[in-house]
A protein has these predicted regions:
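Catalytic histidine-centered segment of alpha/beta-hydrolase-like enzymes
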Residues: 241-250, 254
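Alpha/beta-hydrolase fold catalytic core
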Residues: 1-22, 43-45, 82-84, 234, ...
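Active-site loop/oxyanion-hole signature of alpha/beta-hydrolase fold enzymes
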Residues: 3-13, 36-39, 48-89, 255
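Flexible "cap/lid" loop of the alpha/beta hydrolase fold
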Residues: 99-103, 110-143
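Serine-hydrolase catalytic-loop signature spanning alpha/beta hydrolases and amidase-signature enzymes
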Residues: 26-36, 47
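Conserved loop-alpha-helix segment in the C-terminal half of the alpha/beta-hydrolase fold
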Residues: 206-241
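Conserved alpha/beta-hydrolase catalytic His-Asp/Glu region
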Residues: 141-194, 199
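Gly/Ala-rich beta-loop-alpha elbow adjacent to hydrolase catalytic centers
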Residues: 90, 94, 98
Length: 273
């Protein structure tokens, strides 16, 4: 689908006309980080996982913003033939995009589930380190060499090997001299952690926070975000999980999502205090 002059690639599962579920990946990642999770919901939902611009098989832009990325989420949801407003599930950078989508398009988002996206004050040292880490992606001679070099940021002690191999393979594209990573290094041009802070009080749809036990959303940060959301958002810890919880604890993530979605289907939302 075309959004604001860029072609946005997405994958879809489930029958058109079912309630919608949209999965949004993190920074330097892509839609295939979600395939082994998203497909589990196809019997009840029309499911989509997109490549944000600057990632995966979507076009690159001259500049990037949360506002543009959330327009892409809404555009994919509309194009994928979902019944009514979808629930959006976002990890890391995708969690900030999910918050922006809920805040900017309240009439078009039914719910938001944010996975280990820590909203904090600006940290120039962290942002500089992240930009330098992803600057100038290397060209590798072949797929196997590149896949052997694949690492997440931050790194974790455990991953499911079958997931990592698929994710690594789908992260690469052919170029002169071999293969390189698909993402645009300039997507790391600003602080998403701090820019998301003002979004939280504006979210009016259902929202839930998933916190990885060994991730970046600490209990203190989770409590702060809970307060900013008017004390109506459950903060759910995924045990044993690192920041990239779909790579090391995918079954726990699927179970937590199924439980939450079943509750939302049969319950009345709390109102903000």
């Amino acid at each position: 689908v075309d959004v604001a002059g860029a072609h946005i690639h997405y994958m879809a599962w489930g029958e058109p006309g079912q309630p919608g579920l949209v999965f949004v990946h993190g920074g330097a990642a892509h839609a295939h980080w979600w395939t082994h999770v998203a497909a589990q919901f196809a019997s009840l939902y029309r499911v989509a996982a997109l490549d944000l611009s600057g990632h995966g098989d979507s076009d690159w832009r001259d500049d990037y913003s949360l506002d543009t990325w959330c327009d892409e989420v809404v555009g994919v949801a509309g194009h994928a033939q979902m019944a009514g407003a979808p629930i959006v599930v976002g990890h890391s950078l995708g969690g900030y995009v999910t918050m922006a989508s809920a805040a900017n398009h309240p009439e078009r988002i039914a719910g938001a589930i944010v996975l280990d996206s820590a909203v904090t004050a600006p940290d120039p040292e962290m942002e500089s380190s992240r930009r330098s880490h992803f600057a100038n992606p290397k060209v590798h001679a072949d797929m196997e060499t590149a896949m052997a070099r694949f690492r997440t940021v931050p790194e974790q002690d455990h991953y499911e090997p079958y997931v990592m191999r698929h994710v690594a393979a789908m992260s690469l594209k052919p170029v002169d001299g071999g293969v390189t990573w698909k993402f645009d290094p300039s997507v790391f041009g600003g602080s998403r952690r701090s820019s998301a802070d003002g979004l939280l009080p504006r979210v009016t749809c259902r929202i839930a926070l998933f916190r990885a036990e060994h991730g970046q959303m600490t209990p203190t940060i989770g409590s702060y975000m809970y307060e900013q959301l008017g004390r109506v958002a459950p903060v759910i810890e995924i045990p044993l999980a690192g920041h990239h919880m779909m790579l090391d604890q995918p079954l726990l993530v699927v179970t937590a999502l199924r439980t939450l979605l079943a509750d939302w289907e049969h319950s009345v939302p709390f109102e903000r205090t």
